Structures are given as structure tokens and as C-alpha cells.
């Protein structure tokens, strides 16, 4: 099965190439870039030297020949590709935010007019597997909403309020240099940002509504001086108290068939490079604390995109994703 990665120079693009190289049926035949057309992929992603001989190309949409296309382009750029690819019979997984939210919410949150909106399944397989299976187009979730939603989903319907506190590695900001991610500003620091206004809050609220939760939802992210990982602490304030045995049983039952969710003490080091979400939960009655850890570039982006592709195309869900985390 031939794969095209549109916008392949970023961190998510590099991870797509790495992970798809371990897939039993997928071959990346096209990695696009306007900026470095003609450059070898391994010159931009040195970890892929000896792993791929591809060079970046810059074809028009009509020139792309593939069975599946991954869009790893900036937010608000995905919408210019999707319909044209679908009309040519190419399945699409969009890693941008362009189709995750209802149109009016997207336009309010991202401050742009959507020029080609239509509804797409939200690609969080642990919650929406049957909506994803066999489809031709999937909107891949954001990294923060993935870790947060998996942390809170089992108790969402019992909650009055959910407060998400997330710490993320610097790669979540992408590969464009900025003062925010400049080494002297990041090193030896944990820094909050967009404390009440982060765009991913809209996805978190949307997923809670789909879980029939009526809980108020709040979110504050922080930047960690590490490359990868998101650790999310969800403070779940319940209407009625639940003891430790009850909440553990709820979580273990909820995720008992989920191969990528592990009930164990979460650490971003233990999930690095993998598609796993590790989580644990502790109750003090009407307040439950659930903590999850994911790799923001894998379960939070490229790995989950491949998990969605596998469901779309009828492959084993863990094809290309069966590796353990890189620890230590």
C-alpha cells in the first residue's frame, strides 16, 4: 500500500516515516515539502539515514499517487488538500486541526473561515473505533486532548467538574525556532502558557459532550524542558463519592480490551517512542485524580494517525506500532 506524507519535514512527518517503515503492508512513496524540495529525507531527519532513500518532492495534489495520504501540515492548511485527495480515491488522515471540531467552533477557536468544511470522524480509536473503521477520511486528535480524554473518559459521566493540568515536551511546539522554545528559556524551567485559552480545550469539551458528561471543563498546559511526552493530571470532581476499589475497577473494565492503554504508574520516559498511554487513578471520595502519560509525537500525533489508518484499511490495529517505549 503506497503512502504519501504531505508536509513531511516536521517532527510528525519524521515519525510517520519511521513508524510506517515497520508496517507490514505500507510503503512511503512520497514525502512532500515546498521548502526543501529535492533534499534527501535523511538530511532533514538524520535518524532516518539508512532507513529510507526518499527525497522530498513538491507535487500538486493531482500528481500525488498513493492509497493513503497523511496531512502533516500546519493548522488551517489541511483544508486545501482534503477534498481533492478524496475525489481521487485517496484515503486521508489529517493531523491538522481543520476537521476536528464543528465548523463554528473551529472558526471561533482558530480565527479563520473554513473554506471547505464537512464532518469527519474524530480519530480517537479507544472511544470511536467503529466510527473510524472503514472510513476514507479521519481527523486525527490533538496531543493534549488525547492524553486528557483517555485520563478522564471512564468517569466523565459521573463528574461535575474536570480540571486538566498537562506538562508537555518542547517538540509539541513544532520545529520552527522561537523565543518560547529557545534553549536558555526552556532549560531548568517549567512554564505555564495559555493558562485558560489553549485551543485544545475545545476538543476536550467536545469529547466530554460525546461521553454524555455535563461536567465543567478547565485546562492549563505547561512546557517542560524535555523533547517528548505529555503528562496529564485530571482532577475529576464527582457528584457522588467513589472509593479506590470502585474507580480502579471502572478504569480497568473500561480499557480491558485496549492494547495501547496500560494501567500502570505513568511516566513520559516509559512511553517515549511508543503508541502507549499509561495511566493510573486514585480516589479520595468525591475527588479522583487520574494521571496519563503519552508520547506527544506518537500516540499524540503520528502513531495514532497510523492506528487510524489501520482501522480504515482493515489492518491489525497495532501494525507498525508494536514497539515498546525507549527507556531509559
Curated annotation (Swiss-Prot):
PROSITE patterns: ARGC. Its EC number is 1.2.1.38. Pathway: Amino-acid biosynthesis; L-arginine biosynthesis; N(2)-acetyl-L-ornithine from L-glutamate: step 3/4. One of its GO terms (cellular component) is cytoplasm. It catalyses: N-acetyl-L-glutamate 5-semialdehyde + phosphate + NADP(+) = N-acetyl-L-glutamyl 5-phosphate + NADPH + H(+). GO terms for biological process: L-arginine biosynthetic process. SUPFAM superfamilies: Glyceraldehyde-3-phosphate dehydrogenase-like, C-terminal domain, NAD(P)-binding Rossmann-fold domains. Gene3D superfamilies: Dihydrodipicolinate Reductase, domain 2, NAD(P)-binding Rossmann-like Domain. SMART domains: Semialdhyde_dh (SM00859). Keywords: Amino-acid biosynthesis, Arginine biosynthesis, Cytoplasm, NADP, Oxidoreductase. It is found in: Cytoplasm. InterPro entries: AGPR_AS, AGPR_type-1, NAD(P)-bd_dom_sf, NAGSA_dehydrogenase, Semialdehyde_DH_NAD-bd. It comes from the Archaea. GO terms for molecular function: N-acetyl-gamma-glutamyl-phosphate reductase activity; NAD binding; NADP+ binding. The keyword Cell division does not apply. The active site is at 143. HAMAP family: ArgC_type1 (MF_00150). Catalyzes the NADPH-dependent reduction of N-acetyl-5-glutamyl phosphate to yield N-acetyl-L-glutamate 5-semialdehyde. Belongs to the NAGSA dehydrogenase family. Type 1 subfamily. This is N-acetyl-gamma-glutamyl-phosphate reductase.
Amino acid at each position: 500500500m503506497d503512502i504519501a506524507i504531505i508536509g513531511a519535514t516536521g517532527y510528525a512527518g519524521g515519525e510517520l516515516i519511521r513508524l510506517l517503515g515497520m508496517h507490514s503492508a505500507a510503503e512511503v512513496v512520497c514525502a512532500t515539502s515546498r521548502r526543501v524540495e529535492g533534499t534527501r529525507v535523511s538530511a532533514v531527519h538524520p535518524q532516518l539515514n539508512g532507513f529510507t532513500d526518499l527525497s522530498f518532492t513538491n507535487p500538486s495534489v493531482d500528481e500525488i499517487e498513493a492509497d493513503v495520504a497523511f496531512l502533516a501540515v500546519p493548522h488551517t492548511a489541511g483544508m486545501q488538500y482534503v477534498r481533492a485527495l478524496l475525489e481521487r480515491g485517496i484515503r486521508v488522515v489529517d493531523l491538522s486541526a481543520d476537521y476536528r471540531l464543528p465548523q463554528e467552533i473551529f472558526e471561533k477557536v482558530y480565527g479563520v473561515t473554513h473554506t471547505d468544511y464537512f464532518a469527519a470522524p474524530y480519530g480517537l480509536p479507544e472511544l470511536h473505533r467503529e466510527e473510524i473503521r472503514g472510513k476514507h477520511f479521519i481527523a486525527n486528535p490533538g496531543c493534549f486532548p488525547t492524553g486528557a480524554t483517555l485520563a478522564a473518559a471512564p468517569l466523565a459521566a459521573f463528574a461535575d467538574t474536570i480540571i486538566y493540568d498537562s506538562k508537555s515536551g518542547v517538540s509539541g511546539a513544532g520545529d520552527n525556532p522561537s523565543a518560547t522554545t529557545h534553549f536558555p528559556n526552556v532549560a531548568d524551567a517549567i512554564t505555564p502558557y495559555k493558562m485558560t485559552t489553549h485551543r485544545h480545550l475545545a476538543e476536550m469539551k467536545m469529547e466530554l459532550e460525546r461521553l454524555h458528561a455535563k461536567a465543567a471543563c478547565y485546562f492549563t498546559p505547561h512546557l517542560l524542558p524535555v523533547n517528548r511526552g505529555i503528562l496529564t493530571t485530571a482532577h475529576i470532581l464527582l457528584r457522588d463519592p467513589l472509593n479506590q476499589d470502585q474507580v480502579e475497577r471502572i478504569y480497568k473494565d473500561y480499557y480491558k480490551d485496549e492494547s495501547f492503554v496500560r494501567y500502570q504508574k505513568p511516566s513520559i520516559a516509559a512511553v517515549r517512542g511508543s503508541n502507549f498511554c499509561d495511566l493510573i487513578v486514585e480516589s479520595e471520595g468525591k475527588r479522583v485524580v487520574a494521571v496519563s502519560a503519552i508520547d506527544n509525537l506518537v500516540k499524540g500525533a503520528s502513531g495514532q494517525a497510523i492506528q487510524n489508518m489501520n482501522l480504515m484499511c482493515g489492518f491489525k490495529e497495532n501494525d507498525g506500532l508494536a514497539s515498546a517505549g525507549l527507556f531509559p
